[in-house]
Design a protein with these regions (language model features):
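Conserved acidic
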Residues: 1-297
Length: 297
């Protein structure tokens, strides 16, 4: 389902919060944590069935469905799945191989581009420039949007829904683990979770077993070799698609002495007295400007 929903009397049940303020309209009485809604009197959202059911499980709320569009679930085309897996196999086999840096970069770019190709938004407001007023944007009318969508439908070869629902499933899979590890989560991104010591590792292990079973089922159902879902790297280690890997087990490098974050894509760590930063748009060398983590603001 694709839904337009009005939520009322909304309050999160967990320490972490999940509804992005930027994805909501007409917010009344909102309280926020790093751009995510803690509670609100009301707001409207356009969202998938995956996101809708996740919100109902993590927030106390009332709701009214304003619009509802439906389609039948099915697997992606087998040819497309096999192409995705081919890029994943190549990327994994070229990673950390001396002399194959260019090949690795190319395969990684192709692998990542498969998602971007399905969610490129071609329906944009018209940007206008004149010598008197400078730059401005003119919102498209409904008729212009419909015309643009019809034209785009004739040119596009991938469904926009591929990317939308892949994102929804990935977000749901990540956040279902976050709510079980709630008080131990200090940071999470699109594909990773940073945790305090003392968390229950069985939660991650159980999730990984769940993914392994699903992949085995899909491989058998679609008659695709299971090896394509779990290629080996140059060191002979298998990397099954979709599993959480514990970086701490790979050495002290990923066990931080100190960690600080100012929000999504903005954090710094200290290991053995050395500071490293991860900030969108800022080079790693920017860490030289910090004498301590207290300076990271």
């Amino acid at each position: 389902y694709l839904l337009v929903v009005k939520f009322k009397n909304v309050k999160c049940k967990y320490y972490n919060n999940f509804i992005s303020q930027s994805k909501c309209r007409n917010i009344v009485g909102g309280r926020y944590d790093n751009g995510r809604i803690i509670q609100a009197e009301s707001f409207e959202m356009t969202l998938t069935d995956i996101d809708f059911y996740f919100i109902l499980s993590t927030y106390d709320c009332q709701y009214e469905i304003i619009e509802n569009y439906y389609s039948k679930y099915n697997y992606l085309p087998k040819q497309f799945i096999e192409f995705v897996l081919e890029k994943y196999v190549n990327k994994t086999q070229f990673k950390n191989v001396q002399g194959k840096e260019v090949e690795y970069a190319k395969e990684k770019n192709k692998f990542n581009a498969l998602y971007g190709m399905s969610v490129t938004n071609m329906i944009r407001d018209e940007v206008v420039y004149d010598n008197k007023n400078g730059w401005s944007e003119r919102p498209l009318s409904n008729d212009e949007i419909v015309e643009a969508l019809e034209n785009e439908k004739k040119k596009s070869f991938l469904s926009f829904a591929y990317g939308v629902w892949v994102t929804a499933f990935a977000r749901s899979n990540l956040l279902k683990n976050v709510i079980q590890l709630d008080e131990f989560v200090v940071y999470c991104d699109t594909d990773s979770v940073k945790l305090k010591q003392g968390y229950d590792k069985k939660i991650i292990d159980n999730y990984n077993k769940f993914v392994e079973n699903k992949i085995k089922h899909v491989a058998e159902k679609l008659d695709i070799s299971i090896e394509k879902f779990a290629p080996s790297d140059v060191f002979g280690e298998k990397h099954m698609l979709g599993l959480f890997e514990c970086e701490t087990e790979k050495g002290h490098l990923h066990t931080y002495d100190k960690f600080i974050t100012q929000g999504a894509k903005k954090y710094a760590v200290e290991v053995d007295g050395k500071i490293e930063i991860t900030v969108a748009g800022v080079p790693k060398q920017g860490s030289k400007a910090l004498s301590s983590l207290d300076d990271f603001r």
